Curated annotation (Swiss-Prot):
Cross-referenced SUPFAM superfamilies: Radical SAM enzymes
The protein's Enzyme Commission number: 2.8.4.3
Gene coding for it: miaB
Record domain MTTase N-terminal: where: 21-137
UniProt-recorded name of the protein: tRNA-2-methylthio-N(6)-dimethylallyladenosine synthase
Gene3D superfamilies registered for this protein in UniProt: Methylthiotransferase, N-terminal domain, tm_1862 like domain
Chief place of localization: cytoplasm
Binding site for [4Fe-4S] cluster 1: 30, 66, 100
Species of origin: Mycolicibacterium gilvum (strain PYR-GCK) (Mycobacterium gilvum (strain PYR-GCK))
Length: 512
């Protein structure tokens, strides 16, 4: 950027140009929302807004909300209340609420927080800049909630958070009917992107230096049953084929995916995981409960034996795979015997870690109407027992890693104590978090680089590697991070809206 020399009058036209309005996106909930927030940021930047710096009050605050848990409502409306005095003092400030809670509450958002300017649903991400302009011009709050998907969010511009790792959405929505989950009613039925579109986005990211991608969907192993493009044939084996295709992309070093459903987890996916070198040896597969009776009540169309059988086959094919899960404690009607069944499955499964939740009653879900709602004190006591069991298992599994050589993708923001301990942090191929001593190479190692080191210690939630790096490889991702560059995608990838793609243009002679 050119700097103004001392004593030289600035160009008057530049002084007359108003400073760009700034924005901040606050994200709650799952990885889908994190990825959607990258799209929201990309849209706002494309529209001329600038991301607000740390500690700076933004002109526009966007909430990308979650509706899965009860405290999501409390968190949103509490934060909106905190912004009310700012809005009153500065009417030009704008507040937008999107995501699953906006889709669910709709006009209720304005009744509860009338100072909000824009409410937009899960299918209206692309409308945000227009809605902000309209609200500012008309001085009237704008509400836009579409009932079905009109275009894939992945066709929108994205402002990625990381130079070295990226989300890639392969589907939107869900066809399952879990009784505790409100997501299908808010995000709609599953719609799958064409494999070529997914791979084009992956290639675009790799071309910009990204080393790791995570394929994202509510139920990734149902991929292929409901393509948006009606000319794309239904293919139950599409997800395994997609994994193998990712393995053929030069420069893509790590592939992860989340989340599969146990009822649709097939052996072709296990084979693809084992035979595709850049697919990471890790699996996150929600269990929810170890009780067959509770699984039936949840409408989870598998049973504990099937779940454990999948894990056994994964570990046979990939011996060092780290397996993680989601668990719900206190589902309506859960008895002590049901809860003990969950503890038994957790003990047998030997998860490396687990996301554990106390059941939260959500209006609009079948489970909210079930008899046998469990007292909070009972749920809390069971939750604590489950946490203690999983902490013990996680620590035992992590201690088993001591002495093992690990390859780390160096990360930023993963180690809260890195500055105090003179360590850096990275993720092993199996997803474990490792805090490592950089040794004499410290000044040369950047986030996005690859380091090989040996595990010397363990805690329940991380590993320690204080032996110093045995290898360090500088990468294009590390270069990009050092230069402050993050990849941009979503424009020019040939990604269609919903429906068949436009016909290809007629070419003369040879065309590549």
């Amino acid at each position: 950027m050119l700097q103004q020399a001392d004593g030289v009058s600035p160009d008057r036209s530049s002084c007359d140009t108003p400073a760009p309005r700034t924005f901040e996106v606050r994200t709650y909930g799952c990885q889908m929302n994190v990825h959607d927030s990258e799209r929201l940021s990309g849209l706002l930047e494309q529209a001329g807004y600038q991301r607000a710096g740390a500690g700076v009050d933004a002109d526009i605050v966007v909430f990308n909300t979650c509706a899965v848990r009860e405290n999501a409502d409390n968190k949103l409306y509490g934060n909106l209340s905190h912004l009310a005095p700012r809005k009153q003092a500065d009417p030009q400030m704008q507040i937008a609420v999107g995501g699953c809670l906006a889709q669910k509450d709709r006009d209720a958002v304005l009744r509860k927080a009338p100072w909000v300017d824009v409410v937009f649903g899960t299918h209206n991400i692309g409308s945000l800049p227009t809605l902000l302009d309209r609200a500012r011009h008309n001085r009237v709050a704008q509400v836009e909630i579409a009932e079905s998907l009109r275009e894939f969010p992945s066709a929108l511009p994205a402002s990625r958070e990381s130079a070295y790792a990226a989300w890639v959405s392969i589907s939107v929505g869900c066809n399952n009917t879990c009784t505790f989950c409100i997501v299908p009613s808010l995000r709609g039925k599953e719609v799958d992107r064409r494999p070529g579109d997914v791979l084009a986005e992956v290639q675009a990211l790799v071309d910009q230096g990204v080393l790791e991608i995570t394929l994202l969907g509510q139920n990734v192993n149902a991929y292929g049953v409901s393509f948006a493009d009606p000319t794309e044939a239904r293919d139950r084996g599409a997800f395994a084929k997609l994994l193998r295709a990712c393995g053929r992309i030069d420069g893509l070093e790590r592939v992860r995916f989340t989340s599969p459903h146990p009822a649709e987890f097939t052996d072709d996916v296990i084979e693809a995981m084992a035979q595709t070198s850049n697919v990471c040896p890790t699996l996150h597969m929600p269990l929810q409960s170890g009780s067959d009776r509770i699984l039936r009540a949840m409408r989870r169309s598998y049973r504990a034996d099937r779940y454990l059988g999948i894990i056994d086959r994964v570990r046979t094919a990939i011996p060092h795979a780290a397996i993680t899960t989601d668990l719900i404690v206190g589902f309506p009607g859960e008895t002590e015997e049901d809860f003990q069944a969950t503890l038994d499955v957790v003990e047998a499964a030997r998860f490396s870690s687990a996301f554990t939740f106390q059941y939260s009653k959500r209006p609009g879900t079948p489970a909210a109407e079930l008899e046998g709602q469990i007292p909070k004190a009972v749920v809390s006591e069971r939750y604590q027992r489950l946490i203690e069991l999983q902490e013990r298992i996680s620590w035992e599994e992590n201690r088993a890693q001591i002495g093992r050589e690990v390859e780390l993708l160096v990360a930023t923001g993963e180690g809260r104590k890195d500055a105090a301990t003179a360590r850096m942090s990275g993720r092993a191929r199996d997803g474990r978090l490792v805090h490592f001593a950089p040794g004499a190479l410290g000044a040369d190692i950047r986030p996005g680089d690859i380091v090989v080191t040996t595990v010397t210690g363990a805690a329940p939630h991380h590993l320690i590697a204080d032996a110093g790096p045995a290898e360090h490889r500088r990468t294009r991702a590390g270069d990009a991070h050092a230069e402050g560059r993050t990849p941009k995608t979503g424009v020019g990838l040939g990604m269609p809206g919903i429906g068949a793609p436009e016909p290809a243009p007629v070419t003369q002679g040879c065309a590549l």
